[in-house]
Protein backbone atom coordinates (compact mmCIF):
# COMPACT_ATOMS: atom_id res chain seq x y z
CA UNK A 1 0.00 0.00 0.00
CA UNK A 2 2.85 2.37 0.82
CA UNK A 3 4.40 1.71 -2.60
CA UNK A 4 1.09 2.50 -4.31
CA UNK A 5 0.75 5.75 -2.36
CA UNK A 6 4.31 6.75 -3.31
CA UNK A 7 3.59 6.04 -6.97
CA UNK A 8 0.34 8.04 -6.87
CA UNK A 9 2.16 11.07 -5.42
CA UNK A 10 5.13 10.90 -7.80
CA UNK A 11 6.09 13.63 -10.18
CA UNK A 12 8.17 13.13 -13.30
CA UNK A 13 10.67 15.50 -14.90
CA UNK A 14 11.91 15.46 -18.48
CA UNK A 15 15.64 15.40 -19.08
CA UNK A 16 16.80 18.57 -20.90
CA UNK A 17 18.30 18.22 -24.36
CA UNK A 18 21.34 20.15 -23.17
CA UNK A 19 22.68 21.61 -19.89
CA UNK A 20 23.38 24.85 -21.77
CA UNK A 21 20.47 27.34 -21.39
CA UNK A 22 21.28 28.94 -24.75
CA UNK A 23 21.03 25.60 -26.53
CA UNK A 24 17.75 24.90 -24.73
CA UNK A 25 16.42 28.28 -25.83
CA UNK A 26 17.44 27.59 -29.42
CA UNK A 27 15.65 24.22 -29.34
CA UNK A 28 12.62 25.96 -27.80
CA UNK A 29 12.47 28.42 -30.70
CA UNK A 30 12.86 25.61 -33.26
CA UNK A 31 10.12 23.50 -31.61
CA UNK A 32 7.81 26.50 -31.34
CA UNK A 33 8.29 27.41 -35.00
CA UNK A 34 7.70 23.80 -36.09
CA UNK A 35 4.58 23.60 -33.93
CA UNK A 36 3.12 26.84 -35.27
CA UNK A 37 3.96 25.79 -38.85
CA UNK A 38 2.25 22.46 -38.28
CA UNK A 39 -0.84 24.14 -36.80
CA UNK A 40 -0.99 26.64 -39.66
CA UNK A 41 -0.53 24.07 -42.42
CA UNK A 42 -3.00 21.52 -41.10
CA UNK A 43 -5.58 24.14 -40.13
CA UNK A 44 -5.32 25.60 -43.64
CA UNK A 45 -6.08 22.22 -45.23
CA UNK A 46 -9.04 21.62 -42.90
CA UNK A 47 -10.50 25.09 -43.58
CA UNK A 48 -9.89 24.99 -47.36
CA UNK A 49 -11.67 21.65 -47.65
CA UNK A 50 -14.54 22.92 -45.51
CA UNK A 51 -15.18 26.16 -47.43
CA UNK A 52 -14.61 24.81 -50.95
CA UNK A 53 -17.61 22.78 -52.18
CA UNK A 54 -15.62 21.22 -55.01
CA UNK A 55 -13.51 19.46 -52.36
CA UNK A 56 -16.49 17.92 -50.59
CA UNK A 57 -15.53 14.40 -51.66
CA UNK A 58 -14.52 11.36 -49.57
CA UNK A 59 -10.81 11.81 -50.36
CA UNK A 60 -10.72 15.38 -49.08
CA UNK A 61 -13.05 14.54 -46.20
CA UNK A 62 -10.45 12.07 -44.93
CA UNK A 63 -7.59 14.46 -45.69
CA UNK A 64 -9.25 17.25 -43.68
CA UNK A 65 -9.85 14.93 -40.75
CA UNK A 66 -6.24 13.70 -40.93
CA UNK A 67 -5.17 17.35 -40.67
CA UNK A 68 -7.40 17.86 -37.61
CA UNK A 69 -5.98 14.72 -36.01
CA UNK A 70 -2.45 16.02 -36.62
CA UNK A 71 -3.34 19.28 -34.83
CA UNK A 72 -4.59 17.49 -31.71
CA UNK A 73 -1.79 14.92 -31.95
CA UNK A 74 1.00 17.50 -31.77
CA UNK A 75 -0.93 19.64 -29.27
CA UNK A 76 -1.10 16.72 -26.83
CA UNK A 77 2.65 16.98 -26.19
CA UNK A 78 3.98 20.32 -27.42
CA UNK A 79 2.84 22.75 -24.66
CA UNK A 80 4.46 20.66 -21.91
CA UNK A 81 7.58 20.09 -24.02
CA UNK A 82 7.95 23.84 -24.59
CA UNK A 83 7.44 24.61 -20.89
CA UNK A 84 10.07 22.02 -20.03
CA UNK A 85 12.56 23.56 -22.46
CA UNK A 86 12.10 26.99 -20.90
CA UNK A 87 12.51 25.67 -17.35
CA UNK A 88 15.61 23.57 -18.13
CA UNK A 89 13.80 20.34 -17.23
CA UNK A 90 12.31 21.68 -13.99
CA UNK A 91 8.64 21.57 -15.07
CA UNK A 92 7.07 18.62 -13.20
CA UNK A 93 4.28 16.42 -14.51
CA UNK A 94 2.19 14.30 -12.16
CA UNK A 95 1.79 10.61 -12.81
CA UNK A 96 -1.86 11.30 -13.69
CA UNK A 97 -0.83 14.04 -16.10
CA UNK A 98 1.79 11.76 -17.64
CA UNK A 99 -0.77 8.98 -18.08
CA UNK A 100 -3.27 11.39 -19.62
CA UNK A 101 -0.69 12.68 -22.08
CA UNK A 102 0.33 9.13 -23.03
CA UNK A 103 -3.31 8.09 -23.51
CA UNK A 104 -4.14 10.96 -25.87
CA UNK A 105 -0.86 10.68 -27.76
CA UNK A 106 -1.34 6.94 -28.43
CA UNK A 107 -5.07 7.40 -29.07
CA UNK A 108 -4.60 10.14 -31.67
CA UNK A 109 -1.48 8.52 -33.17
CA UNK A 110 -3.29 5.19 -33.50
CA UNK A 111 -6.32 6.83 -35.10
CA UNK A 112 -3.94 8.65 -37.46
CA UNK A 113 -2.37 5.36 -38.59
CA UNK A 114 -5.77 3.70 -39.12
CA UNK A 115 -7.02 6.71 -41.07
CA UNK A 116 -4.08 6.30 -43.46
CA UNK A 117 -5.38 2.78 -44.18
CA UNK A 118 -8.84 4.20 -44.82
CA UNK A 119 -7.36 6.74 -47.23
CA UNK A 120 -5.55 3.94 -49.08
CA UNK A 121 -8.85 2.05 -49.37
CA UNK A 122 -10.55 5.19 -50.70
CA UNK A 123 -7.88 5.57 -53.38
CA UNK A 124 -8.13 1.87 -54.23
CA UNK A 125 -11.88 2.24 -54.88
CA UNK A 126 -11.40 5.52 -56.80
CA UNK A 127 -8.78 4.09 -59.17
CA UNK A 128 -9.75 0.41 -59.43
CA UNK A 129 -13.55 0.83 -59.36
CA UNK A 130 -14.21 4.39 -60.61
CA UNK A 131 -17.72 3.67 -61.92
CA UNK A 132 -18.86 2.32 -58.56
CA UNK A 133 -16.94 4.86 -56.46
CA UNK A 134 -19.88 7.07 -55.45
CA UNK A 135 -22.01 4.03 -54.71
CA UNK A 136 -19.38 2.36 -52.51
CA UNK A 137 -17.92 5.44 -50.79
CA UNK A 138 -21.19 6.87 -49.50
CA UNK A 139 -21.08 9.62 -46.90
CA UNK A 140 -22.49 7.27 -44.27
CA UNK A 141 -19.61 4.84 -44.91
CA UNK A 142 -17.07 7.69 -44.75
CA UNK A 143 -18.37 8.75 -41.34
CA UNK A 144 -18.38 5.14 -40.14
CA UNK A 145 -14.77 4.67 -41.28
CA UNK A 146 -13.71 7.88 -39.51
CA UNK A 147 -15.47 6.89 -36.29
CA UNK A 148 -13.99 3.40 -36.61
CA UNK A 149 -10.49 4.93 -36.80
CA UNK A 150 -11.11 6.84 -33.57
CA UNK A 151 -12.59 3.80 -31.82
CA UNK A 152 -9.61 1.62 -32.78
CA UNK A 153 -7.23 4.33 -31.57
CA UNK A 154 -9.09 4.43 -28.25
CA UNK A 155 -9.10 0.63 -27.90
CA UNK A 156 -5.35 0.61 -28.55
CA UNK A 157 -4.50 3.44 -26.17
CA UNK A 158 -6.52 2.55 -23.09
CA UNK A 159 -5.09 -0.93 -22.35
CA UNK A 160 -1.52 0.15 -23.17
CA UNK A 161 -1.73 3.13 -20.81
CA UNK A 162 -3.22 0.97 -18.05
CA UNK A 163 -0.56 -1.70 -18.67
CA UNK A 164 2.31 0.76 -18.20
CA UNK A 165 0.91 2.78 -15.30
CA UNK A 166 0.05 -0.39 -13.42
CA UNK A 167 3.80 -0.67 -12.81
CA UNK A 168 5.32 0.72 -9.59
CA UNK A 169 7.63 3.73 -9.90
CA UNK A 170 10.19 4.42 -7.18
CA UNK A 171 13.01 6.92 -6.86
CA UNK A 172 14.05 7.57 -10.44
CA UNK A 173 11.79 10.37 -11.67
CA UNK A 174 13.66 11.67 -14.75
CA UNK A 175 12.18 10.67 -18.10
CA UNK A 176 14.81 10.57 -20.85
CA UNK A 177 12.44 12.17 -23.34
CA UNK A 178 10.44 15.34 -23.98
CA UNK A 179 7.02 13.71 -23.44
CA UNK A 180 5.58 10.62 -21.74
CA UNK A 181 6.40 8.02 -24.36
CA UNK A 182 5.77 4.38 -23.49
CA UNK A 183 9.33 2.94 -23.71
CA UNK A 184 10.81 5.95 -21.88
CA UNK A 185 8.32 5.77 -18.99
CA UNK A 186 8.62 1.98 -18.72
CA UNK A 187 12.37 2.32 -18.13
CA UNK A 188 11.64 4.12 -14.83
CA UNK A 189 9.65 1.25 -13.31
CA UNK A 190 11.18 -0.47 -10.29
CA UNK A 191 9.83 -3.89 -11.23
CA UNK A 192 10.45 -6.61 -13.79
CA UNK A 193 9.12 -5.19 -17.06
CA UNK A 194 9.94 -8.09 -19.38
CA UNK A 195 6.29 -9.12 -19.71
CA UNK A 196 5.24 -5.51 -20.30
CA UNK A 197 7.96 -4.96 -22.91
CA UNK A 198 7.00 -8.17 -24.70
CA UNK A 199 3.32 -7.20 -24.66
CA UNK A 200 4.14 -3.72 -25.97
CA UNK A 201 6.29 -5.19 -28.74
CA UNK A 202 3.64 -7.72 -29.82
CA UNK A 203 0.84 -5.13 -29.80
CA UNK A 204 3.01 -2.62 -31.67
CA UNK A 205 3.96 -5.24 -34.26
CA UNK A 206 0.31 -6.17 -34.86
CA UNK A 207 -0.89 -2.56 -34.91
CA UNK A 208 1.83 -1.49 -37.37
CA UNK A 209 2.14 -4.57 -39.58
CA UNK A 210 -1.56 -5.19 -40.30
CA UNK A 211 -2.36 -1.63 -41.48
CA UNK A 212 0.89 -1.44 -43.45
CA UNK A 213 0.09 -4.78 -45.11
CA UNK A 214 -3.40 -3.57 -46.04
CA UNK A 215 -1.96 -0.35 -47.48
CA UNK A 216 0.63 -2.33 -49.45
CA UNK A 217 -2.01 -4.69 -50.88
CA UNK A 218 -4.17 -1.71 -51.87
CA UNK A 219 -1.26 -0.13 -53.71
CA UNK A 220 -0.40 -3.31 -55.59
CA UNK A 221 -3.89 -3.19 -57.12
CA UNK A 222 -3.65 0.58 -57.59
CA UNK A 223 -0.33 0.36 -59.47
CA UNK A 224 -1.74 -2.34 -61.76
CA UNK A 225 -4.79 -0.16 -62.43
CA UNK A 226 -2.65 2.94 -63.10
CA UNK A 227 -0.55 1.04 -65.64
CA UNK A 228 -3.75 0.21 -67.52
CA UNK A 229 -4.79 3.87 -67.82
CA UNK A 230 -4.25 4.92 -71.44
CA UNK A 231 -4.28 8.67 -70.88
CA UNK A 232 -0.90 10.08 -69.84
CA UNK A 233 -2.67 12.89 -67.97
CA UNK A 234 -4.86 10.40 -66.13
CA UNK A 235 -1.84 8.31 -65.14
CA UNK A 236 -0.01 11.42 -63.93
CA UNK A 237 -2.96 12.58 -61.82
CA UNK A 238 -3.41 9.14 -60.25
CA UNK A 239 0.32 8.84 -59.63
CA UNK A 240 0.51 12.29 -58.02
CA UNK A 241 -2.37 11.56 -55.64
CA UNK A 242 -1.04 8.14 -54.64
CA UNK A 243 2.60 9.16 -54.27
CA UNK A 244 1.62 11.86 -51.76
CA UNK A 245 -0.13 9.28 -49.62
CA UNK A 246 2.77 6.81 -49.91
CA UNK A 247 5.27 9.44 -48.72
CA UNK A 248 3.12 10.23 -45.67
CA UNK A 249 2.72 6.51 -44.89
CA UNK A 250 6.48 5.90 -45.11
CA UNK A 251 7.23 8.83 -42.80
CA UNK A 252 4.60 7.88 -40.22
CA UNK A 253 5.11 4.13 -40.14
CA UNK A 254 8.89 4.29 -40.58
CA UNK A 255 9.49 6.52 -37.55
CA UNK A 256 6.92 4.71 -35.39
CA UNK A 257 8.38 1.30 -36.23
CA UNK A 258 11.87 2.49 -35.26
CA UNK A 259 10.63 3.53 -31.81
CA UNK A 260 8.34 0.63 -30.94
CA UNK A 261 9.82 -2.30 -32.87
CA UNK A 262 13.51 -1.82 -32.09
CA UNK A 263 14.88 -4.57 -29.79
CA UNK A 264 15.31 -3.42 -26.19
CA UNK A 265 19.00 -4.31 -26.30
CA UNK A 266 19.63 -1.91 -29.19
CA UNK A 267 17.24 0.85 -28.05
CA UNK A 268 19.01 4.16 -27.53
CA UNK A 269 17.07 6.75 -25.49
CA UNK A 270 18.93 9.57 -27.23
CA UNK A 271 18.20 8.22 -30.71
CA UNK A 272 14.61 7.51 -29.67
CA UNK A 273 14.21 11.13 -28.65
CA UNK A 274 15.63 12.37 -31.96
CA UNK A 275 13.38 10.10 -34.04
CA UNK A 276 10.40 11.18 -31.93
CA UNK A 277 11.07 14.77 -32.97
CA UNK A 278 10.67 13.58 -36.57
CA UNK A 279 7.23 12.07 -36.17
CA UNK A 280 5.83 14.49 -33.59
CA UNK A 281 6.99 17.74 -35.19
CA UNK A 282 8.42 17.21 -38.68
CA UNK A 283 5.84 14.74 -40.06
CA UNK A 284 2.84 16.96 -39.17
CA UNK A 285 4.61 19.81 -41.02
CA UNK A 286 5.41 17.71 -44.08
CA UNK A 287 1.93 16.16 -44.40
CA UNK A 288 0.14 19.35 -45.51
CA UNK A 289 3.12 20.32 -47.68
CA UNK A 290 3.22 16.94 -49.41
CA UNK A 291 -0.52 16.88 -50.06
CA UNK A 292 -0.86 20.51 -51.12
CA UNK A 293 2.22 20.67 -53.35
CA UNK A 294 1.35 17.46 -55.19
CA UNK A 295 -2.41 17.99 -55.48
CA UNK A 296 -3.67 20.31 -58.23
CA UNK A 297 -7.23 20.63 -56.89
CA UNK A 298 -6.01 21.57 -53.43
CA UNK A 299 -3.51 24.08 -54.84
CA UNK A 300 -6.22 25.67 -56.99
CA UNK A 301 -8.59 25.92 -54.02
CA UNK A 302 -5.83 27.49 -51.93
CA UNK A 303 -5.07 30.07 -54.65
CA UNK A 304 -8.77 31.00 -54.89
CA UNK A 305 -8.99 31.42 -51.14
CA UNK A 306 -5.87 33.60 -51.06
CA UNK A 307 -7.22 35.81 -53.87
CA UNK A 308 -10.35 36.48 -51.81
CA UNK A 309 -8.23 37.87 -49.01
Curated annotation (Swiss-Prot):
Membrane topology, as annotated: Multi-pass membrane protein
Sugar attachment sites: 5
Gene3D superfamilies for the chain: Rhodopsin 7-helix transmembrane proteins
Compartments reported by the entry: Cell membrane
Main location: membrane
Family listed: Belongs to the G-protein coupled receptor 1 family.
Entry function: Odorant receptor.
Domain of life: Eukaryota
InterPro entries from the UniProt entry: GPCR_Rhodpsn (IPR000276), GPCR_Rhodpsn_7TM (IPR017452), Olfact_rcpt (IPR000725)
Stretches assigned to the Extracellular side: 1-25, 76-100, 162-198, 260-272
Lineage, opening ranks: Eukaryota, Metazoa, Chordata, Craniata, Vertebrata
CDD domains found in the cross-reference section: 7tmA_OR10A-like
Transmembrane segments: 26-46, 55-75, 101-121, 141-161, 199-218, 239-259, 273-293
GO terms under cellular component: plasma membrane
Disulfide bonds: 98-190
Keywords: Cell membrane, Disulfide bond, G-protein coupled receptor, Glycoprotein, Membrane, Olfaction, Receptor, Sensory transduction, Transducer, Transmembrane, Transmembrane helix
Molecular function as annotated in GO: G protein-coupled receptor activity; odorant binding; olfactory receptor activity
Segments on the Cytoplasmic side according to the record's topology features: 47-54, 122-140, 219-238, 294-309
UniProt cross-references to PROSITE patterns, sorted A to Z: G_PROTEIN_RECEP_F1_2 (PS50262)
Name of the featured protein: Olfactory receptor 10V1
Species the sequence originates in: Homo sapiens
GN (gene name): OR10V1
Amino acid sequence: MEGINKTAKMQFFFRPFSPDPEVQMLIFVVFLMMYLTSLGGNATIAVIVQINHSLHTPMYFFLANLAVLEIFYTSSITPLALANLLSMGKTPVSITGCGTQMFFFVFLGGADCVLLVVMAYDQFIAICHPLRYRLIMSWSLCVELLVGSLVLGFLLSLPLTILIFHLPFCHNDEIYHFYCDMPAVMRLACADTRVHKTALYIISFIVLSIPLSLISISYVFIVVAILRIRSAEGRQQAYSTCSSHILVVLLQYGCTSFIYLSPSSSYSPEMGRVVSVAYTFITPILNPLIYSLRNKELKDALRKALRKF
